[in-house]
A protein has these predicted regions:
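Hydrophobic alpha-helical transmembrane segments of polytopic membrane proteins
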Residues: 174-211
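Transmembrane alpha-helices
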Residues: 35, 133-165, 192, 197
Length: 240
């Protein structure tokens, strides 16, 4: 309990506003690299996921690729890319690693969102004369958006935690304070920086959870509400 109090005091100490890397700057850098990595991963994974979900081709390869990518050790991937690309490009190498780690969750969310759409909805859209492009843009993409945002949530949580590793390859992000705390055996600094990362991750997840709820089409919300109301009388009868 004493260590927790000391960690809170470390976070709000006046010294956090100055020094080698002020806490506010560390948070901004941590958040910036997270958003950059997720945005690049989304630019790659969303079109690929929509193509797989729309055509049904390449799903097995995508599942295998996503599974293999999730098994990659984050720390080894970051350090390996830094050594391969070069120490002069530490930021670029680190962001590349974060992008590779974020792609599987976004890819899965993109194609599973389209696959989850009921078949009669797709058949109805084709019956009214929609082209494949119109079907994707007007039907599949909007209905699959909640699962896509769910994939973005998973990717964001993974990346915001993994960006901490940048503290081992450079003086960036909140990982810098953790690495510095390990070197100085300053446990309040380690815990304080970790708590800030947790708060940042929870805030991002909560924001994306709200977005995920808002992107559910109104018709789907009404239908799910009607389904729940229909089930309740049946549940009462089964209970009696």
């Amino acid at each position: 309990m004493t260590l927790f109090v000391e960690a809170i005091e470390w976070i709000f100490a006046p010294e956090r506003a100055s020094g080698a890397l002020p806490l506010r700057e560390a948070i901004s850098t941590h958040l910036l690299y997270t958003l950059i990595a997720v945005a690049i991963a989304a630019a790659v994974a969303v079109p690929a996921g929509y193509l797989i979900g729309h055509t049904g081709r390449g799903r097995g390869f995508a599942v295998a690729l996503a599974g293999a990518a999730r098994a990659l050790p984050s720390f080894g991937l970051v350090l390996g890319l830094v050594l391969i690309i070069g120490v002069m490009y530490k930021v670029e190498a680190s962001i590349t690693a974060f992008v590779l780690l974020a792609i599987p969750a976004i890819l899965a969310g993109a194609y599973s969102g389209i696959e989850a759409i009921e078949r009669h909805v797709i058949d109805g859209a084709r019956a009214v004369g929609m082209s494949p492009w119109q079907l994707l843009v007007k039907v599949e993409a909007p209905l699959g958006l909640p699962l896509l945002v769910g994939g973005l949530r998973s990717a964001t949580l993974q990346v915001v935690a993994t960006v901490t590793l940048m503290g081992y390859v450079g003086n960036w992000g909140l990982g810098f304070h953790i690495v510095q705390g390990i070197q100085l055996r300053s446990f309040d600094q380690i815990l304080g920086a970790a708590l800030v990362i947790v708060v940042l991750a929870v805030a991002l997840d909560a924001a994306l959870a709200i977005v995920q709820r808002l992107v559910v089409p109104a018709g789907v919300q009404r239908r799910s509400g009607t389904t729940r109301r229909r089930r309740r009388p049946a549940e009462r009868l089964s209970a009696t």
